[in-house]
Amino acid sequence: MNSGAPKPPNGPPPMKHARIALAVLLAPIALLGAWTAARDAGGTVRIDGSSTVYPFAEAVAEEFSKKNPGTKVTVGQSGTGGGFKRFGAGETDFSNASRPIKAGEIEACKAKSVEFVELPVAFDGLTIVVNPANDWAKQITVEQLKAIFLSSTAAKRWKDVDPSWPDEPIKVYSPGTDSGTFDYFREVVVGKDGTMRADMSVSEEDNVLVRGVAGERNAIGFFGFAYYTENAKKVRAVPVVNPKTGKAVTPTHDTIEDGSYAPFGRPLFVYVSKAGLAKPSCMAFAQFMLDHAGELAEEVGYVKLPQVLYDRAKANLKALRTGTQMIGPDGKDLHGPIAETYR
């Protein structure tokens, strides 16, 4: 039946014309939006934790921010333990650590339903330092360090450690108890259940430790390799006798990488929450970090990992593989080369 209504002209109806016109107008805007999203993740990235890992995290944040100026990245340094407390409470997206996460810290995360992906990022060599005027401690053994740092045997004077050393008081500088460097040193030197001497000057700020040792002729202290290399003119690194070979080894990029600087060579980690990775900003940051970890680790004074470890970390990030690989099924910490434990 012919209603008498006029037939539409050939071509699309008026509404379709309007949609096409609108699409043409919006196309450049859509392209601009896609380009901007690819260029700048936006949002926020919250990082805290180890003061040892801080220079690396800061370098990553600086480079990432150049390419993503719309993303707000904050980097704190409250120590490995302090960082995990905030991380377990859901206050941060990334937690830097100079040691693997502990079983108790994992339980704290579980209590708040915080799942995480574990990412190794670099090697470090915990460095024993003295004042440059110290011309007697040419090398040091783990047993001598124990004599200095263990509370029950704490040597008060250098001659108490070695009779050939001067009759001068020992001034000890140490990272604070929230520091992963403190935990690592204590475990290696005095044992997990050992107590460190109580008269140490402690600080979570490695620069404070540098100034302390640099200003005291009879001082001894320890911190990460990057802070040593940054301040090598102010303090002197003491070669450590490798317990297996009996040879004194100075921390360098080569000796840390090949494992001869033992027992103080160690991997550094960044932990990222699964909830954080749901944010484009955090996923973009984590991917950028792993893409550039080797070069930035070297740039700030650490030692890059073998590429196979970065590849494994990228695969674990992509798969959102949660949990730690540094604790065995029996609940005990795993030791040995990280390439054998991290898969």
Protein language model annotation of sequence segments:
Residues 1-44:
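Short, low-complexity disordered leader/linker segments with a strong preference
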Residues 35-343:
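Flexible loop/hinge segments at secondary-structure junctions
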